[in-house]
Amino acid sequence: GTEANGFQANFNGNGHTITNLRINTNQKFFGLFGKINGADIKNVGLVNCNVNNTGTGWDHAYIGTLVASTEGGTLENCFSTGIVNGSVCVGGLIGATHQTTTTNCYSECNVTGVENVGGLIGNPDGAGNHVVNCFASGTVKGNKNVGGLLGSISSEVVNCYASGAVSGNESVGGLVGSGWSSYAIKNSHSTGSVNGKLYTGGLVGWRGNASITSNCYASGNVIGEKYT
């Protein structure tokens, strides 16, 4: 699906995998599925991906292996391995989600971006998002809003974890880089090392207002310069 015409059907991979997916672009909304609108994607794996966006800024945003961006729908029992490089809203599996439930998914991708960069999802944005029973294990590098699982959130996260090393400059967290208003993190943890400069945390880098965190922990080494 494109930005103007998102994919609206349902896709069931029936447990199959796609190997050696290669994407090299300087455009926005790129992944196996560019954009989905209310679609259900389930039971598919992507192995040894190499997704690379050479552009910079929001004009080149939304990059993931499986899905670039969602508006509604569900993702269930999906995974990816490989390498992802992008600019804004970059994720090991999904670039960004809106009003979407992501369940039983994981990514082992090494992810590099600039802003809103996550090991699984770059930016699950909005109260209608739910991320449940998911994990990420790859390294994550970026500049701002960088998280081992999720880059920047205003959503619900339940029973999730991240184990990869995370590094960045501002709002850097082992699980979540930046948490905005009305988000909740429950029964989740991170174990990877975290290295940042401004707003750095083992679990969450920058915590916004109206947040709820319960039954969570972080065990990785944390290095920061200010607000750590």
Question: Which residues make up each language-model segment?
Answer:
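Surface-exposed repetitive/solenoidal architectures
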Residues: 1-228
